């Protein structure tokens, strides 16, 4: 999903241009890969297993994450929570955490805020944009979506590495690592509240149901 094409009209003629997806979503993938390395290096500190998955087909209404949960992975009932890393490359756009107002996940975020952190996310009450967390909500799995939000270069040829803020991404990575560790070491499970999800997503884009 990190590169594609778009058709623009130049001098009255359709011209196909490449867009590179540096922020959408090579930035999230880069954070995921480095986070996986950090978790592996410090695996003895994690009480729960942490599974890293990169989903494709987001433009097909998140078919990749749907397929993982419904066709590929047999142990979805053992998933306690999901962390969605999507578009994390901007430095002047804010850093957000969307949980569909999940009390348990918000409690972890607030606990982390009381500790020394390189950056803190703003908890968003409303879904910032649809992403792969949607498929996990459909399975009643709590999920948090970390992102720097929407941006004008998305799905255009201007989505190049020049718009990325690498220092900010490093701060986000360190925070997300600390959050992942706190989530993995938390006592008990995390409750899913379907009423919260339906309320927060009711005015957002529809998601196709696959069979």
Which residues are covered by each model-predicted region?
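Sec-exported extracytoplasmic/periplasmic mature domains
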Residues: 34-44, 70-74, 110-118, 177-188
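Soluble non-cytosolic domains of exported or imported proteins
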Residues: 19-30, 44, 59-63, 99-104, ...
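Catalytic-core environment of secreted peptidases
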Residues: 1-53, 73
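His/Asp/Glu-rich mid-to-C-terminal helical/loop segments that flank catalytic regions of hydrolases
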Residues: 30, 152-202
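Solvent-exposed, polar/charged alpha-helical surfaces in well-ordered, non-transmembrane soluble domains
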Residues: 29-33, 37, 66, 107, ...
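Metal-dependent peptidase/peptidase-like ectodomains
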Residues: 55-150, 165
């Amino acid at each position: 999903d990190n590169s594609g094409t778009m058709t623009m009209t130049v001098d009255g003629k359709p011209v196909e241009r490449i867009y590179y997806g540096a922020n959408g979503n090579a930035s999230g993938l880069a954070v995921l890969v480095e986070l996986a390395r950090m978790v592996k290096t410090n695996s003895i500190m994690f009480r729960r297993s942490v599974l890293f998955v990169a989903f494709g087909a987001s433009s097909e209404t998140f078919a990749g994450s749907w397929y993982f949960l419904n066709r590929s992975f047999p142990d979805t009932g053992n998933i306690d929570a999901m962390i969605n890393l999507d578009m994390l490359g901007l430095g002047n756009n804010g850093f957000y955490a969307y949980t569909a107002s999940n009390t348990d996940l918000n409690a972890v975020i607030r606990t982390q805020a009381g500790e020394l952190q390189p950056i803190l996310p703003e908890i968003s009450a409303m879904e910032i944009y649809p992403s792969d967390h949607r498929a996990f909500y459909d399975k009643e799995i709590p999920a948090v979506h970390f992102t720097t939000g929407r941006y004008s270069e998305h799905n255009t040829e201007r989505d190049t590495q020049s718009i990325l803020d690498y220092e900010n991404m490093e701060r986000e990575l360190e925070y997300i690592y600390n959050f992942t560790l706190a989530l993995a070491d938390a006592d008990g499970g995390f409750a899913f509240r379907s009423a919260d999800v339906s309320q927060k997503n009711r005015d957002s884009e529809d998601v196709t149901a696959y069979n």
